[in-house]
Swiss-Prot record:
This is Small ribosomal subunit protein uS3c. It is found in: Plastid, Chloroplast. InterPro entries: KH_dom-like_a/b (IPR015946), KH_dom_type_2 (IPR004044), KH_sf_prok-type (IPR009019), Ribosomal_S3_C_sf (IPR036419), Ribosomal_uS3_bac-typ (IPR005704), Ribosomal_uS3_C (IPR001351), Ribosomal_uS3_CS (IPR018280). Pfam families: KH_2, Ribosomal_S3_C. GO terms for molecular function: rRNA binding; structural constituent of ribosome. Its main location: plastid. The lineage of its organism: Eukaryota, Viridiplantae, Chlorophyta, Mamiellophyceae, Mamiellales. The keyword Endoplasmic reticulum does not apply. GO terms for cellular component: chloroplast; cytosolic small ribosomal subunit.
Amino acid sequence: MGQKVHPIGFRIGVTQTHRSQWFAKPKDYAKLVEEDLLIREFAESRLPDAGISRINISRQVDRIEIEFFTARPRALVGAKGETLTQLRDEIKAKLPDTRNVALYVTKTQQPEMEAICIAENIAEQLEKRTPFRRTMRQAIMRARKAGAEGIKIQISGRLNGAEIARHEWAREGRVPLHTIRADIDYATARAQTIYGILGIKVWVCKGEKSC
């Protein structure tokens, strides 16, 4: 059943941490979850070229701290920080309550091993009509060269414009989905092609962590 469980949610508290860290009263919980979702979706749609791999949100009484992990921090911050300041003001305007919003940016050291970066790069290549097998091979080669223990990529849809949709996958190294201590990163992406939407799934094994 390991393939039917979300690999990150399956490992929360062992090798993965919660992306949102805060406490709330039961009556406020749904509202704050909706706010978190709004912040994430807005930031990703506002800066699609920033290579954001993860967004962590923590809350205090009247303060929200948002940490962006990105492969291209300059695209997120701007030349003199004006892009980040503008993003903070726009997020603050979208929140229903007036609160202090603090943004932090952390550079992703190895984007070649980040599942979301790999998936989005594959989607970009497929939209440019690059052959899907070559795209998968190149992504696997880069991830393995960066130090990944294993990687699996699956692409689904009307591949090469075929009449019948199918899925194809490629794997190199070990990707143990049942091993909870395995540090598995997982992400999905979509490619809009002239034949329809292609779905991309990426699993990256970065090693094992002690429980």
